[in-house]
C-alpha cells in the first residue's frame, strides 16, 4: 500500500476519533460532572474493545483490507483513546489527595482496557 495513502487514512481516522472523544468527554462532563473522568475512561475502554475487534477481524478474515486497520486501529482508536489525558487526570487525583480514586481509576483503566480488548477479540472469534 502507498505510504501517503496510509498516512491519510490514519489522519482521517484520528481526526474522527479525536472529535468523538471530545464529544464523549463533553457529554459526560455535563451529565455526570467531573467526580471521575468518565469520558476518558469510556473512550479508552471502548477504544480498547474496538481495537480488539479490528485485529480479530483481520486475523479471522485474511482478505480483510489492511487499509481498514490503518483507518480504524491506528487512526480512529489512536485519536479516540488517550493515554496522555489519562496520565494527567491520574496525576491531578494524586496531587489533590484523592488516593482511593487515583488507585481505582488506574485499575479500572488498565485492567478494564485489557479486558475490553480481550472481549473484542473473543466476540469476533466466537461469533
Swiss-Prot record:
Keywords: Cell inner membrane, Cell membrane, Ion channel, Ion transport, Membrane, Metal-binding, Sodium, Transmembrane, Transmembrane helix, Transport. Its main location: membrane. The chain crosses the membrane at residues 8-28, 37-57, 68-88, 100-120. The keyword Cell membrane applies. It comes from the Bacteria. Na(+) binds at residues 78, 81. Na(+) is not transported, but it plays an essential structural role and its presence is essential for fluoride channel function. It is a multi-pass membrane protein. One of its GO terms (molecular function) is metal ion binding. Pfam families: CRCB. GO terms for cellular component: plasma membrane. It is found in: Cell inner membrane. It catalyses: fluoride(in) = fluoride(out). One of its GO terms (biological process) is cellular detoxification of fluoride. NCBIfam families: crcB. Fluoride-specific ion channel. Important for reducing fluoride concentration in the cell, thus reducing its toxicity. Belongs to the fluoride channel Fluc/FEX (TC 1.A.43) family. This is Fluoride-specific ion channel FluC. It comes from Leptospira interrogans serogroup Icterohaemorrhagiae serovar Lai (strain 56601). The gene is fluC.
Amino acid at each position: 500500500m502507498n505510504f501517503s495513502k496510509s498516512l491519510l487514512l490514519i489522519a482521517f481516522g484520528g481526526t474522527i476519533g479525536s472529535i468523538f472523544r471530545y464529544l464523549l468527554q463533553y457529554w459526560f462532563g455535563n451529565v455526570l460532572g467531573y467526580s471521575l473522568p468518565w469520558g476518558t475512561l469510556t473512550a479508552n475502554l471502548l477504544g480498547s474493545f474496538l481495537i480488539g475487534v479490528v485485529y480479530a477481524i483481520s486475523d479471522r478474515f485474511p482478505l480483510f483490507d489492511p487499509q481498514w486497520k490503518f483507518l480504524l486501529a491506528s487512526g480512529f482508536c489512536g485519536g479516540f483513546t488517550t493515554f496522555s489525558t489519562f496520565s494527567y487526570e491520574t496525576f491531578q487525583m494524586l496531587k489533590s489527595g484523592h488516593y482511593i480514586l487515583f488507585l481505582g481509576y488506574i485499575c479500572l483503566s488498565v485492567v478494564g482496557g485489557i479486558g475490553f480488548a480481550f472481549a473484542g477479540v473473543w466476540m469476533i472469534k466466537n461469533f
